[in-house]
Amino acid sequence: MPTSNTMKIKTKRPNLYLRVSKGHFATSNSHSNYYIDVATQKSRLSEAKAVADELCNYYRHNTIVDTILCLDGMEVVGTCLADRLTSGDYVNMNAHQTIYVVTPESVNSSQLLFRDNIVPMIQGKHVLVLAVSVATGRTVEAAVEAVKYYGGEVAGIASIFATSHECSGYTVNSVFDPNDLPDYKNYSSNDCPMCKKGEKIDALINCHGFSKL
């Protein structure tokens, strides 16, 4: 972890928790006082299943999901979520009893695209946007814009951690939120109080992880 000030936020599930470090962290467009490490939730099957089980409860009874659009390396969680939403023990809203799991290509920091062979999995489909976190919301906003551009309908937004319950006019459902991390702060990179106090940045962070400075 990027700092020694780390802790785990536990849930009722023994294999589902949030590992965080407190410090001064920078992304490409914001600064925060916590680094939230979700590497194991994204990569370890048992934890990805636990995340999927939690998120499934928001959509299994009343939401049609044809496609799960995975951002930030969430393909393992997305596959587990698709499996849960189409399993026999849940009431399934999907007419075809199956779900596409796709990822977009990034043109630049604010635009996403789908190749011609992927477009049919978006166009005319109910698309659930799945992200690691929703903090500034820029990546999710780009995903929502892309889904609409390619003729899809946004079915909802889901994430492991979110600081807001709404983004681009859609409800955000998450496993963890500020109630689990009440002193979490996210600032614009040019208006960061930690920078103004002269506090050094501990690490650069993005959806892939961290790099200590």
Tell what function each PLM region has.
Residues 2-12, 144-213:
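PRPP-dependent phosphoribosyltransferase catalytic core
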Residues 57, 83, 87, 145, ...:
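Short, well-ordered alpha-helices that flank and scaffold nucleotide-derived cofactor binding pockets
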Residues 63-74:
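Short glycine-rich phosphate-binding loop at a beta-alpha junction
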Residues 113-159:
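A contiguous pocket-lining binding segment that forms or flanks enzyme active sites
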